[in-house]
């Protein structure tokens, strides 16, 4: 079992990043790959959780130990697998998640991808009071210059599709941001806030 990896970030896709360490490239599933954009070809430390299946050994990575802790608590809930947990963690500010769990806000929890009423209730039952304090904002928030807004928006939409959001929902998101110019990370962050509001 791995705790973290330190190596050079060599590749970013809509679903995962690749970190090279000791001559090996590790494919790591992360909540928001584009939040690592500023770290390409640089040394990074990624906190890890390994999932072993019959057909695959999967690595899930996180910017911080707080982010990893949220993920681990989520996958302890019946009905929530690693992919769903990662989609939930993708919402940068997890304070809302913690507050919803502690206050039994089922409707809020059901706005997360693939979370129905039964699973939301189970989240409250299993996790209420388990978070000592709201975790810090997850992911990197450094802004970078953007000269190709539409390209960045395309990347953001692709990442949101990978997180489980439907094309119909994202069509409205694209229209909302079409005339703006942001980084993919900023688009994802803003889009998630709108999607959570319904």
Swiss-Prot record:
One Gene Ontology biological process: DNA repair
Stretches for region Domain II: 64-142
Subcellular location: Cytoplasm
Ranges for region Domain III: 148-198
Cellular component aspect of the GO annotation: cytoplasm; Holliday junction helicase complex; Holliday junction resolvase complex
Record CDD domains: UBA_RuvA_C
SMART domains, per database record: HhH1
Pfam families: HHH_5, RuvA_C, RuvA_N
Cystines in this chain: none
Family stated for the protein in its record: Belongs to the RuvA family.
Function: The RuvA-RuvB-RuvC complex processes Holliday junction (HJ) DNA during genetic recombination and DNA repair, while the RuvA-RuvB complex plays an important role in the rescue of blocked DNA replication forks via replication fork reversal (RFR). RuvA specifically binds to HJ cruciform DNA, conferring on it an open structure. The RuvB hexamer acts as an ATP-dependent pump, pulling dsDNA into and through the RuvAB complex. HJ branch migration allows RuvC to scan DNA until it finds its consensus sequence, where it cleaves and resolves the cruciform DNA.
Assembly information from the UniProt record: Homotetramer. Forms an RuvA(8)-RuvB(12)-Holliday junction (HJ) complex. HJ DNA is sandwiched between 2 RuvA tetramers; dsDNA enters through RuvA and exits via RuvB. An RuvB hexamer assembles on each DNA strand where it exits the tetramer. Each RuvB hexamer is contacted by two RuvA subunits (via domain III) on 2 adjacent RuvB subunits; this complex drives branch migration. In the full resolvosome a probable DNA-RuvA(4)-RuvB(12)-RuvC(2) complex forms which resolves the HJ.
Name assigned to this protein: Holliday junction branch migration complex subunit RuvA
């Amino acid at each position: 079992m791995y705790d973290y990896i330190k190596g050079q970030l060599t590749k970013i896709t809509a679903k995962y990043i690749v970190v090279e360490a000791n001559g090996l490239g590790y494919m790591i599933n992360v909540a928001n790959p584009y939040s690592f954009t500023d770290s390409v070809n640089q040394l990074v430390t990624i906190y890890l959780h390994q999932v072993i299946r019959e057909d695959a050994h999967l690595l899930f990575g996180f910017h911080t130990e707080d982010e990893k802790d949220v993920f681990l608590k989520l996958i302890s809930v019946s009905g929530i697998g690693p992919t769903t947990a990662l989609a939930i963690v993708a919402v940068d500010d997890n304070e809302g998640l913690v507050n919803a769990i502690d206050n039994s806000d089922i409707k809020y929890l059901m706005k997360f991808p693939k979370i129905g009423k039964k699973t939301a209730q189970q989240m409250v039952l299993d996790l209420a009071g388990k978070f000592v304090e709201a975790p810090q904002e997850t992911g990197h928030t450094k802004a970078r210059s953007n000269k190709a807004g539409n390209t960045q928006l395309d990347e953001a939409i692709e990442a949101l599709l990978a997180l489980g959001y439907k094309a119909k929902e994202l069509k409205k998101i694209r229209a909302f941001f079409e005339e703006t110019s942001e980084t993919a990370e900023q688009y994802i962050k803003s889009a998630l806030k709108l999607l959570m509001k319904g």
